[in-house]
Amino acid sequence: MVASISPYYGVSFLEFFLVFFSRLFSGKLFYDHLYIDDIQVIVFFAIAVSCSVVGTFLVLKKMAMYANVVSHTILFGLVCVCLFTHQLIHLSMQALTIAAVSTTLLTGASIHFIRNVFKVAEEASTALVFSLLFSASLLLLVFLTRNAHVGTELVIGNADALAKTDILPIFLVLLINLGISYCFFSSFVCVSFDTIFAFSLGIRIRLVDYLIMLLLSASIVGAFKAVGVLMSLAFLLIPGLIAKLIASSVQEMMVYSMVFGGLAALIAPALSRSILSIYGIGLSTSGLAVGLLLVFYVVMLVFVCSKRAIMLRQKLDK
């Protein structure tokens, strides 16, 4: 059954949530026709939670730079897959997975190879690999596709092109991330804080690093169509950075990360729809979500700094 008019048509910001939650609690989301707004909320929320799980460990391990490199260099693998499959937009999940995993492993191996063979600092080898692979991907994208629209979708995604079939893959990625993080939680935490102590306990540090790399690539694959390979970096890192400001334990940090990421995922589609309804302007849903995450970070940073300043002033007064 395909409805002619979306119940979200012409709604305001608050009305969007009234419509969505009424459809959710009435069960229509499970057996009725899913509209693009329903799909965007579901997919963005799953992406936010999935990326928040991995992002917590990336922030703790100070792998933000590596995540940045992978989110850019993975474009090289996607362009190569486009060339072999002759599919520029409708890539299969298998092709995306192969591209993401192979490029992630290639990036990590290249960084270690340059660092160990040429005896340069890890930051220098990371910057070199990033520059080479990302520039190569852009050159291939420009000279072989000559299609700016395709390039835009690869970079920032296209939330309006999401379909019902995109829900299952991202939930599979979410379950994989949650399952592996639960099984190896203590190892991830131990390696994140003290690699020497983790090694003394018999934890295989390299294996843990590769597991995190695989979770990272899986998260980027899940987020590719909705937010692109570059916007996914914000979903991976910003919620974790926000949570780190206020959390007192790793568990709290992961929960707060999911909360802030989930809030951005819920608000962005509603904000995009309301702006379209009121002003007739279509804005990128993924761009709005990233903008909201940045606003959350600035607000929490100001709040934490103000709280610390007040506490310091109270101590000085005593």
UniProtKB/Swiss-Prot annotation:
Give a GO biological-process term: response to zinc ion
State the source organism's domain of life. Bacteria
Q: Which UniProt keywords apply?
A: Cell inner membrane, Cell membrane, Membrane, Transmembrane, Transmembrane helix, Transport
Of the GO CC terms on this record, one is: ATP-binding cassette (ABC) transporter complex
Q: Where are the transmembrane segments?
A: 1-21, 39-59, 64-84, 94-114, 124-144, 170-190, 196-216, 226-246, 252-272, 285-305
Task: Write down the InterPro entries for this protein, in alphabetical order.
Answer: ABC_BtuC-like, ABC_TroCD
Q: Where in the cell is it found?
A: Cell inner membrane
| Topology in the lipid bilayer | Multi-pass membrane protein
Please classify the protein's predominant subcellular localization into one broad category. membrane
Q: Where, if anywhere, are coiled coils annotated?
A: none
* Disulfide cross-links: none
- Function text: Part of an ATP-driven transport system CT_067/CT_068/CT_069/CT_070 for a metal.
Family membership, please give it. Belongs to the ABC-3 integral membrane protein family.
Entry protein name: Probable metal transport system membrane protein CT_070
